[in-house]
Amino acid sequence: MANRKLFIKSYGCQMNVYDAGRMADVMAPLGYDLVSEADGADLVILNTCHIREKAAEKVFSDLGRLRPFKEAMAAEGRRMLVAVAGCVAQAEGAELMARAKIVDMVVGPQAYHRLPEMVAKVERGAGRVLDTDFPIEPKFDFLPAPQAHGPSAFLSVQEGCDKFCTFCVVPYTRGAEYSRPVADVLREAALLAEGGVREITLLGQNVNAYHGEAPDGRTWGLGRLARALAEIPGVARLRYTTSHPRDVDDDLIAAHREVAALTPFIHLPVQSGSDRILAAMNRGHDVEGYRRIIDRLRAARDDMAFSSDFIVGFPGESERDFQATLALIDEVRFIQAYSFKYSPRPGTPAAALSAQLPEAEKSARLIALQARLVEIQQAFNQACVGRPMDVLLDRPGRHAGQLVGRSPWMQPVHLEAPAALLGTLAPVVVETATSNSLAARLVEGNSSMSSDRVLAEEAPPPARIRA
């Protein structure tokens, strides 16, 4: 009997990408193979995001597109099962079931290890399934060993959030902060490395709030965990996301100084450059505190660069508040960023605020902010020209003889290289740059080049920040 087909579409964050991979791992023993198209799939999973209204509404649009596929399969005597997973499922599960009859299963982000049971229940005619309970025992205890798919992999070490920013649904959809035990993380990382993974990105809603229990009963923070992961044979690079400024501690900063595998690039969301707006968001820090963290991290590694999240048009944001955000962007010189118009999320405190801004004003501010960010990104990329760096080659390029990889700062790098180098860290020198990527040539030498610690001097320098 031929294996069944599984199609998964993920929306939103890297955690959803990780979760999608683990769903595939859960279903693989039942004979489900991943496919790239929903048409003809036996099981379709929409792994959803609830951060913004647009992302949530897109789920219903995609469900409408699935209907003809499901009906066509039914006409052939076959059955397509449709599951909605992720944060929309958690927040709006009952509404999904009522509004979209095409949906067979609604699966919360802490329940997808039970997918095989849900599928079996639907297949035996026991009705549709809604499972959005937060389990007493962590889902990780029930997941199979991870499968390596290429030289880079995500590894979830922390989930949930206790911060309760006024704009955010994550505490309600992902639950309280939970850190996986140290031994489990190290075991999973070792399995990935044995499968050829060279770069591991540690994931968490607040990943640097990690406080996992070690075998001796002590609690490890993210810095100590990074040191242990770097000792695993084969692990050449470590990244982590998403971090919160409140959880950047002394040991994590020291780890960036001491652990060569930790890349000099941190996603550290600030959301706004205005103290007034940060307080309204309940972020738990002010702009000066954020500056001090940036300054300390740059003191640990002088090639450190940053990305961030920005929300424009938060309720009550004045033009002065917005200009303060632009000033912080100019000061820190973020080389990447995710930026959005404020989107009220039902049930969050900010949604009830009266000073909501007009959409036109939010749009104009977003355009201005993104233009400023693009200028900085272009300058950073251009300043990399002529510089040596190590690139993790992770996929073939568009042209014959071309490979594509990632720089330490996450820029895509294109170069001519033999296919045998796929999956390795290769020493290169950057020859040209665009706003989005770099082109480089392969050079002779050891792939563990220290040149990853070079920050392009020709770029407009990041402002030194007051201690």
From Swiss-Prot:
Family matches, as SMART domains: Elp3
What InterPro entries is this protein classified in? Elp3/MiaA/NifB-like_rSAM (IPR006638), Methylthiotransferase (IPR005839), Methylthiotransferase_CS (IPR020612), Methylthiotransferase_N (IPR013848), Methylthiotransferase_N_sf (IPR038135), MiaB_methiolase (IPR006463), rSAM (IPR007197), rSAM_horseshoe (IPR023404)
Query: Which residues belong to any copy of the Radical SAM core domain?
Result: 147-379
Q: Is the Metal-binding keyword given for this protein?
A: yes
- Identify the domain of life: Bacteria
| Annotated TRAM domain residues | 382-444
User: What are the required cofactors?
Assistant: [4Fe-4S] cluster
Entry EC no(s): 2.8.4.3
Q: Where does [4Fe-4S] cluster 1 bind?
A: C13, C49, C87
Any one of the GO CC terms: cytosol
GO MF entries = 4 iron, 4 sulfur cluster binding; metal ion binding; N6-isopentenyladenosine methylthiotransferase activity
Q: Which UniProt keywords apply?
A: 4Fe-4S, Cytoplasm, Iron, Iron-sulfur, Metal-binding, S-adenosyl-L-methionine, Transferase, tRNA processing
Cellular localization per UniProt: Cytoplasm
Q: Which residues form the MTTase N-terminal domain?
A: 4-124
Q: Where does the protein principally reside?
A: cytoplasm
Cofactor, how bound (note): Binds 2 [4Fe-4S] clusters. One cluster is coordinated with 3 cysteines and an exchangeable S-adenosyl-L-methionine.
How does the record describe its quaternary structure? Monomer.
Q: What does this protein do?
A: Catalyzes the methylthiolation of N6-(dimethylallyl)adenosine (i(6)A), leading to the formation of 2-methylthio-N6-(dimethylallyl)adenosine (ms(2)i(6)A) at position 37 in tRNAs that read codons beginning with uridine.
Q: By what name is this protein known?
A: tRNA-2-methylthio-N(6)-dimethylallyladenosine synthase
User: Which organism is this protein's natural source?
Assistant: Rhodospirillum rubrum (strain ATCC 11170 / ATH 1.1.1 / DSM 467 / LMG 4362 / NCIMB 8255 / S1)
